[in-house]
């Protein structure tokens, strides 16, 4: 399997981001809100992730390259990049794919994109297969910027 050429610079970028992981805000109920601008900026009034207790919640993530906020090419590469972005945020928040509690995936064409989502998930979780996290995949009429896929996850942080 060949990963996109962006992966090596992305690893260095993630290493920097992990070193900088601090909440942007902590609520009175001790919920940390993260919007790490060193990854990519959100395009609206939401944050990329939050932590409540030992649970990390990652918002819907698309297939942007963090280095330049352009979308990966349509198809498998975009689906993979969306999952890699979620993985990167999980690691930034102190978790990893093996601690994923639940996935929710939105696609604009179930028959076209679900097989690619399955391939990417099998690839990324190959070390723990067949213990995949619970997943809901939904076909939606439209995603932001007419994108094809968006993935969100809930992760366990440990005790």
Each predicted region: which residue ranges?
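N-terminal presequence-like segments and the immediate start of the first folded domain
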Residues: 3-84, 88-93, 98-101, 107-159
């Amino acid at each position: 399997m060949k990963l996109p050429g962006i992966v090596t610079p992305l690893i260095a970028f993630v290493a920097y981001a992990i070193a900088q992981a601090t909440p942007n805000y902590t609520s009175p109920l001790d919920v940390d809100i993260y919007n790490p601008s060193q990854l990519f900026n959100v395009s609206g009034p939401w944050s990329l992730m939050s932590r409540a207790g030992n649970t990390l919640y990652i918002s819907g993530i698309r297939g942007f390259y963090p280095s330049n906020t352009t979308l990966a090419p349509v198809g498998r590469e975009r689906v993979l990049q969306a999952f890699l972005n979620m993985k990167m945020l999980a690691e930034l928040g102190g978790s990893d794919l093996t601690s994923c509690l639940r996935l929710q995936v939105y696609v604009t064409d179930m028959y076209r994109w679900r097989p690619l989502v399955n391939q990417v998930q099998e690839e990324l979780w190959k070390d723990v297969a067949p213990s995949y996290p619970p997943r809901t995949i939904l076909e939606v009429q439209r995603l932001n910027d007419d994108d094809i896929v968006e993935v969100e996850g809930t992760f366990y942080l440990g005790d």
